[in-house]
Amino acid sequence: MKKSILTAFYGGTFDPIHNGHIKSAIALAKLIHLNRIILIPNGSPVHKPIPVASAEDRINMINLAISEISEDIFEIDYREINNKIPSYTINTFENLRKEYGPKAPLGFILGQDSFMKLHTWYRGYDILKFCHLLICARSNNMINLKKIKFKFIDPKILHYIPFGLIYYAFTPIIKISSRNIRLRYKFGISCNGLISSSVQKYINKKNIYKR
């Protein structure tokens, strides 16, 4: 069986991108030996409220955040944020599979909380027909592995098989949320340590979350 390097995609509203996004992604990259994580910011998310920050501001904040870290593994895919209609994850991965071909290993990074709601997504579990699911821990409450027919696998296998596996990554628990950061800005509470310094300056300069 021939090994190919797994390409991982990390979708989200990133409103704003914060240290939890970055640190959990880097931790996952080290666990499963990723050298490429492609961020896919949502345009009009189906399962979340309309973003507060504009598409342009969210893209600028992502670029600022990833420019501050030493790991050169992050890229941005603009397909969803440039889409004028709501984007479904299944459609994105159908297109990615066509672009990368049938044999390329692809992975979708999502938090434990999002994974537990996957059954509510449009064709949520069909995503496994196109990529692996890479689950990052979000709390100390462990997923009921038997209930979801979860199997622990050697992460090396993710680089040999193109799709269909679920991997639970014991990444550090980082209790940060974009919603909490927006509320902090609204009420004038410091966000030091939660987002990068350049993103903080950008938010303050444009007064994004105090409107």
Swiss-Prot record:
One of the protein's GO biological processes: NAD biosynthetic process
Catalytic activity as recorded in UniProt: nicotinate beta-D-ribonucleotide + ATP + H(+) = deamido-NAD(+) + diphosphate
EC id: 2.7.7.18
Coiled coil: none
Pathway(s) served: Cofactor biosynthesis; NAD(+) biosynthesis; deamido-NAD(+) from nicotinate D-ribonucleotide: step 1/1
InterPro entries: Cyt_trans-like, NadD/NMNAT, Rossmann-like_a/b/a_fold
CDD domains per UniProt: NMNAT (cd02165)
Molecular function terms, GO-annotated: ATP binding; nicotinate-nucleotide adenylyltransferase activity
Keywords attached to this entry: ATP-binding, NAD, Nucleotide-binding, Nucleotidyltransferase, Pyridine nucleotide biosynthesis, Transferase
NCBIfam families membership: cyt_tran_rel (TIGR00125), nicotinate (nicotinamide) nucleotide adenylyltransferase (TIGR00482), PRK00071.1-1 (NF000839)
Record family assignment: Belongs to the NadD family.
Function (record text): Catalyzes the reversible adenylation of nicotinate mononucleotide (NaMN) to nicotinic acid adenine dinucleotide (NaAD).
The protein's name in its UniProt record: Probable nicotinate-nucleotide adenylyltransferase
